[in-house]
Amino acid sequence: MFKERPDGYGLRLGDWRTGLLWTLAGCAGMGLILWFAARHPTMASFYEQRAPDGAGRIILLNAIEMWGWEFMWRGLLLFGLARALGPGPAIWLQAVPFAFMHLGKPQVETFTTIFGGAAFGYIAWQTGSFVYPFLIHWFILSFTMLLATGRIG
């Protein structure tokens, strides 16, 4: 890994047109769902307790956290596993530990992450980049926190 180029692990723009379409569709679709889901008492309570002070800090700190998450799951794990096993198994295998990392979060979120992780894996594989899952995931987390804390909506 250390002698390989970072773009082999999705650290590149890849197919940016497809990535942009997935990002816009993913953010719009999840924005609509989260408009209601993030206000559920369980979600609101969970994220309100964990949100940093101020909208700017929420957005910045979530960007840093999600960059690391997406590089780990969709960068290293997905592209690394795909070399050995092919893209189909790699997409599902990288989604499993991703889902386990959501244990302890609100139940509805935990149950949906296996499919969300697989969707992020598919987008990363299709575009050749983990940047687009990062943008969607960053939006999801930040939008959820901003809604849950009453900073928007």
Predicted regions: what is each one?
Residues 2-71, 83:
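Juxtamembrane helix-loop-helix connectors linking adjacent transmembrane helices
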Residues 4, 100-108:
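Membrane-interface helix caps and helix-loop-helix hairpins in membrane proteins
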Residues 15-20, 51-55, 84-92, 106-107, ...:
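Membrane-helix interface segments
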Residues 26-31, 87-102, 138:
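Small-polar-interrupted transmembrane alpha-helices in polytopic inner-membrane proteins
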Residues 51-55, 68-78, 94-102:
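Short juxtamembrane and helix-loop transition motifs at transmembrane-helix boundaries
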Residues 55-60, 68, 72, 111-119, ...:
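Membrane-embedded alpha-helical segments of multi-pass membrane proteins
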Residues 74-85, 146-149:
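Membrane-interfacial alpha-helical segments at the cytosolic side of multi-pass membrane proteins
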Residues 88, 92-95, 109-153:
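Functionally important transmembrane alpha-helices
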